[in-house]
């Protein structure tokens, strides 16, 4: 994975550098910035986890696409705060929250869903 690909996926998932560094790379934010700048190579395990998260996002989108195909206009929860998300999803973490935000924002901005 190139540095630009890493940054593109991180931004698509709505993760900031510190969140990605802590929860995916388990490194300092500075190390993550080195990967994104191209100063250091992206480790294979980080590449795989980012690709896995992008796949999870696609699965989430597929579930919404099925609802749309059935004629439903989904109402998607957009959590402003991590604490709100965790109250409804206690087994998740910041990564799940950001994935949820990413998908909800996409469908809302494309006019396919309402946010609640």
From Swiss-Prot:
Effect after changing residue 39 to A: Loss of regulation by Aca2 at the transcription level
Binding residue positions for DNA: 34
Q: What GO annotations for molecular function exist for this entry?
A: DNA binding; metal ion binding; RNA binding
User: Keywords assigned by UniProt?
Assistant: DNA-binding, Metal-binding, Repressor, RNA-binding
Q: How does it assemble?
A: Homodimer.
Function statement = Represses the expression of the acrIF8-aca2 operon. Regulates the transcription and translation of phage anti-CRISPR acrIF8 gene (AC H9C181), which is necessary because the expression of this gene rises rapidely upon infection to enable evasion from host CRISPR-Cas defense but is probably toxic to the host cell. Aca2 repressor can inhibit acrIF8 transcriptionally through DNA binding to 2 inverted repeats in the promoter region and translationally by binding conserved RNA stem-loops on mRNAs thereby blocking ribosome access.
Q: Name the chain's protein.
A: Aca2 repressor
Q: What is the lineage of its organism?
A: Viruses, Duplodnaviria, Heunggongvirae, Uroviricota, Caudoviricetes
């Amino acid at each position: 994975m190139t540095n630009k690909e890493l940054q593109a996926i991180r931004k698509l998932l709505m993760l900031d550098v510190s969140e990605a560094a802590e929860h995916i790379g388990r490194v300092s934010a500075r190390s993550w910035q080195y990967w994104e700048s191209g100063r250091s190579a992206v480790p294979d395990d980080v590449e795989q986890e980012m690709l896995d998260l992008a796949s999870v996002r696609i699965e989430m989108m597929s579930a919404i696409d099925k609802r749309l195909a059935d004629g439903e206009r989904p109402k998607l929860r957009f959590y402003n705060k991590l604490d709100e998300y965790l109250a409804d999803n206690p087994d998740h973490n910041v990564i799940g929250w950001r994935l949820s935000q990413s998908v909800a924002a996409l469908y809302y901005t494309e006019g396919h869903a309402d946010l609640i």
